[in-house]
Design a protein with these regions (language model features):
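Generic C-terminal helix-cap and adjacent flexible tail
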Residues: 157-163
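Two-component histidine phosphotransfer core
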Residues: 1-143, 149-155
Length: 163
């Protein structure tokens, strides 16, 4: 079927990105392609129970960031957030500029984040990698309104001439 063929294509993209990333640093466009393949696989699993929106302005597509920055955060949002909902889950990913930073927001509509769990190992590792690579001005912050949303915000330096 067409759906099975599409799923195989997304699996192929996801595994290729996992195995053959050319370097530790990738473009935001490449990272979004990787996370979108992952999201399409999850959408096949959850079907109409998972809605996804991506909002990345073209002028930010060539900003650089460490590979595998978004996928662990998105995986947490599904595993600890939307998959726990009885109704439909939503994952929203957006990129914007704020002052001299690239700001990436990953938000779910579950609002189930527990500070004691610290978001798990994946989120902690991403935060440590961002801070080690870019300094303590960068990293992850979490905002949660119980039963409404959890928003993970990643701050990275903005490259003025990325293209």
């Amino acid at each position: 079927s067409d759906q099975a063929a599409q799923l195989v294509q997304f699996l192929s993209t996801f595994f290729r990105k996992n195995l053959k990333r050319p370097s530790e640093i990738v473009t935001l466009a490449d990272e979004i392609e990787h996370v979108n393949a992952y999201l399409q696989i999850e959408k096949a699993r959850f079907q109409s129970r998972l809605q996804v929106s991506l909002s990345v302005p073209d002028d930010l597509a060539y900003q650089h960031l460490p590979a595998f920055t978004l996928q662990p955060i998105v995986e947490n949002a599904i595993k600890h957030g939307t998959s726990q909902l009885l109704g439909s889950g939503e994952i929203m990913i957006s990129a914007s500029r704020f002052n001299r930073h690239l700001v990436l927001d990953i938000e779910d509509n579950a609002g189930l984040y527990e500070a004691s769990a610290s978001g798990g190992l994946g989120m902690s590792l991403v935060d440590k990698r961002l801070r080690a690579h870019f300094g303590d001005d960068c990293g992850i912050t979490v905002a949660c309104e119980p039963d409404r949303y959890t928003r993970i915000t990643l701050r990275l330096p903005l490259e003025e001439n990325a293209c």
